[in-house]
């Protein structure tokens, strides 16, 4: 809803107090980075091209594009050689790191994560969770995550919101909700 891929059945969607409309949705998208469960990568593009696609569309120079992608690869611990591969040639953890890089490419104000660990095996999940927590703390960004895993919610969030039928049922710290 926030990035305009789905229209609300009723009501309205606002970001930073501003109503999201078809006319301004692209401006809102530039302020939000998002990662979906399977990464949402384009299979016919290399990892590097997947990350830089929007920035290239916005007119970034080749030098700026490569510098930012290399910076994000270091931040997410994605091996340099992985940038030249296609998504099908990458592990699940590498694809998620790539999705995170793409979300961070334009230095968004807000980062949305939709089940970012859902398809990963436990060892990859643990490594990626540790890395993500460090990354998000260092960037000092607002991060919202959708997850069915309460432990994951508590690991990442200082505030957890439980939803039921599209409404807030409870909110607080994980410790508060467990009590």
Q: What spans do the regions from the language model cover?
A:
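Helix-to-loop junction immediately C-terminal to a conserved catalytic motif
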Residues: 3
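Conserved ABC ATPase signature
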Residues: 86-90, 94
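ABC ATPase "signature
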Residues: 171-172
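Conserved ABC ATPase "signature" C-loop
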Residues: 165-166
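Conserved ABC ATPase "signature" region
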Residues: 56, 63-81, 133-134
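Conserved ABC transporter NBD signature motif
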Residues: 11-19, 28
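Conserved catalytic motifs of ABC-family nucleotide-binding domains
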Residues: 107
């Amino acid at each position: 809803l926030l990035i305009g891929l789905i229209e609300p059945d009723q009501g309205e969607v606002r970001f930073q107090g501003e109503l999201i409309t078809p006319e301004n949705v692209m401006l809102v998208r530039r302020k939000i980075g998002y990662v979906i469960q399977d990464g949402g990568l384009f299979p016919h593009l290399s990892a590097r091209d997947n990350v830089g696609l929007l920035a290239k569309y916005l007119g970034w120079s080749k030098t700026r594009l490569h510098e930012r992608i290399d910076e994000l690869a270091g931040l997410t611990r994605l091996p340099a050689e992985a940038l030249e591969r296609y998504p099908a040639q990458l592990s699940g953890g590498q694809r998620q790191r790539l999705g995170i890089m793409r979300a961070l490419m334009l230095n968004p104000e807000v980062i949305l994560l939709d089940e970012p660990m859902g398809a990963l095996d436990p060892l990859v999940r643990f490594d990626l969770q540790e890395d993500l927590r460090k990354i998000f703390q260092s960037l000092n960004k607002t991060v919202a995550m959708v997850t069915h895993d309460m432990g994951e919610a508590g690991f990442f969030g200082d505030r957890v919101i439980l939803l039921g039928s599209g409404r807030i049922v409870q909110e607080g710290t994980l410790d508060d909700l467990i009590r």
